[in-house]
Amino acid sequence: KGKGFWSWASKATSWLTGPQQPGSPLLKKHR
């Protein structure tokens, strides 16, 4: 059920963080 959300989340995260830092604070916050 959350597959679509995760695919969108990963896309949004990579878009938000950009190529600057792959391990952005957003990901750390989410975990």
UniProtKB/Swiss-Prot annotation:
Main location: secreted
Compartments (UniProt record): Secreted
Domain of life: Bacteria
A biological process from GO: killing of cells of another organism
Keyword Secreted: yes
Protein name: Bacteriocin leucocin-B
Any one cellular-component term (Gene Ontology): extracellular region
UniProt key word Secreted: yes
Coiled-coil features, chain-numbered ranges: none
Source species: Leuconostoc mesenteroides
